């Protein structure tokens, strides 16, 4: 099946949107409804193994993190939404068992979503995110991306003096990729980066606080 990215808007400022582990091009909640389509053109893409690209072969890596390294002159700004760092993500034995079992076990996926949103959201919401991830990703890709974002480390290749403006956004109830984690990783690799903590939300602000997320993204992207 041909890949059909979701395009929102027709503005002059183009934005490539890459989803997370449980997402897809069409798994951004209601965020697209609150974006400024007159100023921006957003292209929501499926990663290999997700959405329309579930049958795509090749490697499943967090190579998208290396866009600034590969083509710095083509990136005007970078926004990370609850992003994993360029380093590996340390886990204890229990944590690894939970995450590595998520490819085959829907219950593990639900537990991860519940944990990373502060154990405060409804079962209906959690079940919907789990269902979307099951329907829009292949088991092989889901497992392979975990191994990449949890164990790959290319932080030594990053240049602290990079001039590209960087914004990092996290939710206050996400205990896994918290503000403290960003301060120890992203803000070290990109010393000029900005960090915003969104209130009343965790790891999925596109569902939990979409208006605040859209506002934060576009305030940063829209600056001269």
Annotate each predicted stretch with a short phrase:
Residues 1-16, 33-41, 136, 151-154, ...:
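Alpha/beta-hydrolase fold catalytic core
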Residues 2, 32, 37, 41-69, ...:
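Active-site loop/oxyanion-hole signature of alpha/beta-hydrolase fold enzymes
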Residues 18-20, 170:
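The conserved beta1-alpha1 loop
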Residues 20-30, 42:
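Serine-hydrolase catalytic-loop signature spanning alpha/beta hydrolases and amidase-signature enzymes
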Residues 70, 74-106:
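Flexible "cap/lid" loop of the alpha/beta hydrolase fold
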Residues 88-91, 105-161:
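Conserved alpha/beta-hydrolase catalytic His-Asp/Glu region
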Residues 165-201, 207:
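Conserved loop-alpha-helix segment in the C-terminal half of the alpha/beta-hydrolase fold
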Residues 207-219:
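Post-His helix in hydrolase/transferase enzymes
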């Amino acid at each position: 099946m041909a890949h059909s990215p979701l395009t929102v808007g027709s503005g002059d400022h183009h934005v490539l949107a890459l989803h997370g582990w449980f997402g897809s091009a069409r798994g951004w909640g209601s965020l697209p409804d609150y974006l400024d389509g007159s100023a921006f053109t957003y292209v929501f893409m499926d990663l290999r193994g997700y959405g329309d690209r579930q049958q795509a072969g090749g490697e499943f890596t967090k190579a998208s993190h290396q866009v600034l390294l590969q083509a710095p002159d083509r990136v005007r700004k970078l926004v990370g939404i609850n992003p994993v760092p360029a380093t590996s993500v340390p886990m204890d034995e229990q944590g690894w068992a939970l995450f590595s079992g998520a490819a085959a076990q829907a219950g593990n996926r639900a537990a991860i979503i519940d944990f990373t949103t502060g154990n405060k959201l409804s079962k209906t919401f959690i079940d919907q995110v789990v269902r979307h991830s099951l329907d829009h990703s292949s088991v092989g890709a889901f497992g392979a991306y975990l191994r990449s974002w949890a164990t790959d480390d290319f932080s030594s290749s990053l240049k602290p003096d990079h001039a590209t403006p960087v914004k990092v956004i996290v939710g206050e109830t996400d205990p896994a990729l918290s503000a403290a984690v960003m301060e120890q990783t992203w803000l070290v690799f990109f010393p000029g980066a900005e960090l915003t903590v969104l209130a009343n939300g965790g790891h999925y602000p596109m569902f939990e606080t979409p208006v605040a997320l859209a506002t934060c993204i576009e305030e940063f992207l829209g600056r001269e």
